[in-house]
């Protein structure tokens, strides 16, 4: 479906879009505090894959979102003294990332602006805009049992005509070693980075309920 470029520009810079942009620009810019890592952060995935490959951690990385608590549990038993070079740098980045993301009791705001001349319909693992222009804002809060992640996106001239989108919004609750979540969560299944034949992020997330383990440690019995 082709769009008139002049109409697209006028739509993106409409008074409503400008008002939302100015309003969100007044919000402090910080990252979210979330116990689940959604697909999109290519550097985090590369660091985790490297640490997996050299035997520092042992966590499944083929079904996203992944549990950061699982990564933390594996990382805290690692012997960092034997690391050097790229492995040491990856270890430090992941450790700092976990310290920030798993901090509890603090509400955090975030704001993003993305523009793309030719949005990709076939998307890879890396987070990319689905439309020609997007303004995104969110609020997240985490404690020892519950998580709330609110996200709203205004899209310029979207393909499906839905200008306001709740993609990324979800609420969750820890139930023992399980995390129960409900909302619009991005999912990625498979080892690929340029695409997934199982489940990828080409389509926008649909509302659903997800139950996954917080820690991937093996069961104590064979049953």
Language-model region placement:
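N-terminal secretory signal peptides that target proteins for export/translocation
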Residues: 1-15
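N-terminal signal peptide c-region/cleavage motif recognized by signal peptidases
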Residues: 26-28
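N-terminal propeptides
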Residues: 32-57, 76-112
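Short loop/turn motifs that connect adjacent beta-strands in outer-membrane beta-barrel proteins
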Residues: 60-62, 83-85, 97-109, 141-148, ...
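Transmembrane beta-barrel outer-membrane domains
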Residues: 104, 128-132, 160-166, 200-204
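Transmembrane beta-barrel strands of outer-membrane/channel proteins
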Residues: 109-117, 150-154, 182-186
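Surface-exposed coil loops of outer-membrane beta-barrel proteins
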Residues: 114-124, 162, 185-223
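Residues on the lipid-exposed face of transmembrane beta-strands in outer-membrane beta-barrel proteins
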Residues: 135-141, 169-175, 182, 209-215
């Amino acid at each position: 479906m082709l769009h008139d470029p002049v109409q697209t520009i006028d739509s993106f810079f409409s008074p409503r879009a400008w008002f939302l942009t100015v309003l969100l620009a007044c919000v402090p810019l910080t990252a979210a505090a979330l116990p689940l890592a959604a697909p999109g952060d290519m550097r985090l995935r590369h660091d985790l894959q490297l640490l997996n490959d050299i035997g520092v951690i042992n966590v499944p990385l083929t079904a996203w979102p992944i549990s950061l608590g699982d990564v933390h549990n594996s990382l805290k038993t690692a012997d960092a003294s034997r690391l050097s070079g790229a492995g040491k740098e990856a270890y430090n980045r992941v450790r700092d990332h976990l310290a920030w993301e798993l901090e509890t009791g603090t509400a955090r705001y975030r704001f993003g602006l993305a523009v793309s001349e030719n949005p990709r319909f076939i998307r890879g693992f890396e987070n990319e805009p689905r439309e020609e222009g997007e303004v995104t804002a969110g609020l997240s809060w985490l404690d020892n049992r519950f998580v709330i992640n609110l996200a709203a996106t205004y899209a310029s001239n979207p393909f499906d005509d839905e200008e306001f989108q709740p993609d990324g919004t979800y609420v969750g609750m820890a139930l023992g070693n399980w995390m129960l979540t409900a909302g619009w969560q991005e999912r990625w299944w498979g080892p690929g980075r340029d695409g997934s034949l199982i489940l990828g992020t080409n389509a926008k997330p649909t509302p659903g309920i997800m139950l996954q383990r917080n820690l991937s440690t093996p069961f104590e019995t064979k049953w």
